[in-house]
């Protein structure tokens, strides 16, 4: 029996972070057709499992708890699946990493398609994307991360910060190889972390299933079309 119900569009993008955390922890979950998600999303807030504007939304089938907003879901899963570090500082840094990842994908999609990518906009954005990569890289290096070993916030095993960071860069680089090239130039340790985690059976299987289900899809819509015209 599935452990969770995940409401997210049939694309990787923001939902992929939640899928990765569940897969890494060996959990099973249901997903739903886009029409079903739209129905849940548009319901009166008094009738929603948790009042929310848009997906992802997760329901823990064991407890009935419902959570929306990607960072909140990630931290809930980290807490309940024992994927968070012990110290208050490292938990706060975990949340920072998750929030940073959320910011990066928003910027990659021009804040959800506020406007479309053009060659000039991409040229202007590339240094900023490189800086984002170096922010993740410096975070890891301050905690002993190298291209071949270690974790983003130190410790002996991967946690929410590692899984989210690896998923951010692995998914973007897989869909847009030029992003992978930029990552190798700016954040070799993070690139190594993503390779190592996505070589593990749980995440390797997730990547394969994602490819089978969604093909080359990343975020969908006109914004993805503009990304594919320009980010190459």
Positions of predicted regions on the chain:
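Long, amphipathic alpha-helical surface segments
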Residues: 201-203, 217
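GST-like domain detector, emphasizing the conserved glutathione-binding G-site
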Residues: 1-127, 224
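Acidic/histidine-enriched, glycine/proline-rich intrinsically disordered or flexible terminal extensions
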Residues: 210-232
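GST-like fold's C-terminal all-alpha helical module
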Residues: 89, 96-199
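Exported/periplasmic ABC-transporter solute-binding proteins
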Residues: 203, 209-210
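Active-site-flanking alpha-helical
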Residues: 78, 168-169, 207
């Amino acid at each position: 029996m599935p452990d969770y119900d995940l409401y997210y569009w049939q694309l990787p993008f923001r939902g992929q972070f939640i899928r990765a955390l569940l897969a890494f922890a060996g959990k099973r979950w249901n997903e739903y057709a886009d029409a079903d998600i739209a129905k849940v999303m548009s319901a009166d807030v008094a009738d929603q499992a948790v009042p929310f504007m848009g997906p992802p939304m997760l329901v823990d089938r064991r407890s009935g708890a419902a959570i929306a907003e990607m960072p909140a879901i990630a931290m809930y899963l980290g807490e309940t699946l024992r994927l968070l570090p012990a110290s208050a500082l490292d938990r706060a840094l975990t949340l920072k990493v998750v929030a940073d990842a959320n910011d990066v994908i928003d910027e990659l999609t021009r804040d959800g398609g506020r406007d479309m990518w053009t060659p000039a906009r991409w040229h202007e954005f590339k240094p900023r994307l490189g800086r984002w990569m170096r922010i993740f890289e410096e975070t890891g290096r301050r905690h002993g991360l190298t291209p071949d070993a270690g974790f983003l916030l130190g410790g002996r095993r991967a946690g929410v910060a590692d899984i989210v960071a690896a998923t951010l860069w692995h998914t973007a680089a897989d869909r847009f190889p030029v992003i992978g090239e930029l990552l190798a130039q700016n954040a070799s340790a993070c690139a190594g972390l993503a390779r190592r985690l996505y070589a593990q059976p749980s995440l390797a299987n997730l990547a394969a299933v994602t490819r089978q289900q969604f093909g080359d899809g990343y975020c969908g819509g006109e914004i993805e079309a503009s990304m594919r015209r320009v980010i190459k």
